[in-house]
């Protein structure tokens, strides 16, 4: 498998800062409930012992250390792209620390505070070497696997439309479902952030 192209720049950020009310709740219960991704190596994934690790997890631990004086006072809630904002809005989690692109509509319409950007990335396409494709402009007619309801899905639609190419989207709520579908040959292309493609490639057969 190889990654062949990037689409613009996306940002991976921490969405939702600890407000005064949230901070009070966190201190009263004695731990931070932190929303993370569902297993993205390097960002948020459990090791063989079940301990979460990665950049996003480190942010959770840093917030716990700053608010509670103990980096270990964190409980992790794995969330899909579809679930992440609802979980934060409903109070199921105190903060969200996972790969999430900050956009103007999200910044203004969700009622959430976006913290500073901690990772810049670009979207890419991954295809099997056997297809002999070297450019994203050769993907006309391809079936494309991705996460449903994400900027990744919208960016792909914009890219194919602006280049006058047909394609079929094959979208799933959970990233593991995307990986399984791509591995099983249900689509020709896997698209997400380039860092995500590099991480998920390790799970392919």
Place the predicted regions along the sequence by residue.
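A ligand-binding cleft/hinge motif common to bilobed small-molecule-binding domains
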Residues: 83, 99-109, 155-162, 181-205
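Acidic, polar ligand-binding/catalytic clefts
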Residues: 61, 65, 73-138
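Bilobed "Venus flytrap"/periplasmic-binding protein-like clamshell domains
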Residues: 33-42, 52-67, 101-102, 121-179, ...
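N-terminal hydrophobic or amphipathic helices and topogenic motifs
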Residues: 3-8, 18-75
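Gram-negative bacterial Sec-dependent N-terminal signal peptides
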Residues: 13-14
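Alpha-helix boundary recognition
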Residues: 27-28, 89, 137-140, 180-183, ...
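Alpha-to-beta junction loops
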Residues: 32-33, 69-72, 89-98, 142-143, ...
């Amino acid at each position: 498998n190889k990654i062949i192209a990037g689409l613009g720049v996306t940002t991976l950020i921490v969405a939702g800062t600890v407000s005064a009310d949230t901070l009070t709740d966190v201190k009263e219960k004695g731990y931070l409930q932190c929303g993370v991704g569902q297993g993205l190596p390097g960002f948020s994934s459990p090791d063989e012992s079940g301990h979460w690790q990665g950049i996003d997890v480190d942010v959770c631990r840093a917030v716990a250390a700053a608010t509670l004086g103990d980096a270990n006072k964190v409980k992790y809630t794995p969330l899909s792209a579809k679930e992440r904002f609802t979980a934060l809005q409903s109070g199921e989690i105190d903060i969200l620390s996972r790969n999430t692109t900050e956009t103007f509509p999200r910044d203004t319409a969700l009622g959430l505070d976006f913290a500073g950007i901690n990772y810049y990335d670009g979207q890419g396409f991954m295809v099997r070497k056997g297809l002999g494709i070297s450019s994203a402009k050769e993907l006309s007619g391809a079936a494309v696997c991705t996460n449903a309801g994400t900027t990744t899905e919208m960016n792909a639609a914009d890219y194919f439309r602006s280049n006058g190419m047909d394609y079929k989207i094959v979208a799933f709520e959970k990233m593991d479902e995307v990986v399984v579908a791509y591995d099983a040959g249900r689509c020709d292309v896997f698209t997400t952030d380039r860092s995500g493609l590099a991480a998920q490639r390790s799970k392919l057969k």
